[in-house]
């Protein structure tokens, strides 16, 4: 019964992490807004910034990985490798979220020293969508940290309890 509960707990965590990464991916991909000022037209989309593209690619990789691991049998010998891949996915989410947050902050506040003006006043819907994607990405990251701890406990704990 305990093993079944642990398996279901891990499955729920993986499913939630998959959903959060997929939500971050979809919201970021659909973020776009066009604004016109007098004769000047401005279109904001995620492909304008390399950090947002990296965020999309990272969340796509994590989503595919999360989906595939859902179907891995519990008796598989690959679970030790899954712990390593969980760590890689956690670091991938961390780096992509950090880069996207930095760019989003510049978009929102600007950077007076570099002469970059904030754009969120002109394209608020775009900025709101980016914020939503970043929130979903942060949720995915937190779930992956929990999943990593859970995976480490599941794989390492049996070795610690064995008698020599």
From Swiss-Prot:
Signal peptide residues on this chain, from the entry's feature table? none
Q: Subcellular location, in the record's words?
A: Cell membrane
* A GO CC term assigned to this protein in UniProt: plasma membrane
Which residue ranges run through the membrane?
8-28, 52-72, 81-101, 130-150
Per its UniProt entry, which superkingdom is the organism in? Eukaryota
Q: Identify its membrane topology class.
A: Multi-pass membrane protein
Q: Which residues lie on this side of the membrane: Extracellular?
A: 29-51, 102-129
The record's subunit annotation is: Homodimer and heterodimers.
Identification of the protein by name: CASP-like protein 1C1
| Species this chain originates from | Arabidopsis lyrata subsp. lyrata
Upper lineage: Eukaryota, Viridiplantae, Streptophyta, Embryophyta, Tracheophyta
């Amino acid at each position: 019964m305990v093993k079944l509960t642990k398996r279901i707990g891990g499955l729920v965590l993986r499913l939630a992490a998959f959903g959060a990464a997929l939500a971050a991916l979809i919201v970021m991909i659909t973020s776009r807004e066009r604004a016109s000022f007098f004769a000047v037209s401005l279109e904001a989309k995620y492909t304008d910034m390399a950090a947002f593209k990296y965020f999309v690619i990272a969340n796509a990789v994590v989503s595919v990985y999360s989906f595939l691991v859902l179907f891995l049998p519990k008796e598989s010998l690959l679970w030790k490798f899954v712990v390593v891949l969980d760590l890689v996915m956690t670091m991938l989410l961390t780096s992509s979220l950090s880069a996207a947050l930095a760019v989003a902050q510049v978009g929102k506040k600007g950077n007076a020293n570099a002469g970059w003006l904030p754009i969120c006043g002109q394209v608020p819907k775009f900025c709101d969508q980016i914020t939503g994607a970043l929130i979903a990405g942060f949720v995915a990251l937190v779930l992956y940290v929990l999943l990593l701890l859970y995976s480490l406990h599941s794989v390492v704990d049996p070795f610690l309890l064995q008698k020599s």
